């Protein structure tokens, strides 16, 4: 078992990845900014602390998810995020 450190967007997003009971998971923090992420596998993102404003491919509107709320993203897709305050998240690869 190991912990994988990741840094994206010039350090604006940092995560720690690990495997738990055969499922890949990461936890991390996003600094204020706008980001676009691509997915390979389906994902479930849960906001741990803060808020994420999300727009998934095919959606016209932005949706805000706050602490304790989750959203799913399809595999082989992408989603845009607006982060107004530093926000902690959990990402589960489904």
Swiss-Prot record:
It catalyses: a purine D-ribonucleoside + phosphate = a purine nucleobase + alpha-D-ribose 1-phosphate; adenosine + phosphate = alpha-D-ribose 1-phosphate + adenine; cytidine + phosphate = cytosine + alpha-D-ribose 1-phosphate; guanosine + phosphate = alpha-D-ribose 1-phosphate + guanine. The gene is ppnP. Transmembrane segments: none annotated. HAMAP family: Nucleos_phosphorylase_PpnP. It comes from the Bacteria. Keywords: Glycosyltransferase, Transferase. SUPFAM superfamilies: RmlC-like cupins. InterPro entries: Ppnp, RmlC-like_jellyroll, RmlC_Cupin_sf. PANTHER family: PYRIMIDINE/PURINE NUCLEOSIDE PHOSPHORYLASE (PTHR36540), PYRIMIDINE_PURINE NUCLEOSIDE PHOSPHORYLASE (PTHR36540:SF1). Catalyzes the phosphorolysis of diverse nucleosides, yielding D-ribose 1-phosphate and the respective free bases. Can use uridine, adenosine, guanosine, cytidine, thymidine, inosine and xanthosine as substrates. Also catalyzes the reverse reactions. GO terms for cellular component: cytosol. One of its GO terms (molecular function) is guanosine phosphorylase activity. It comes from Vibrio parahaemolyticus serotype O3:K6 (strain RIMD 2210633). Its EC number is 2.4.2.1, 2.4.2.2. This is Pyrimidine/purine nucleoside phosphorylase. Belongs to the nucleoside phosphorylase PpnP family.
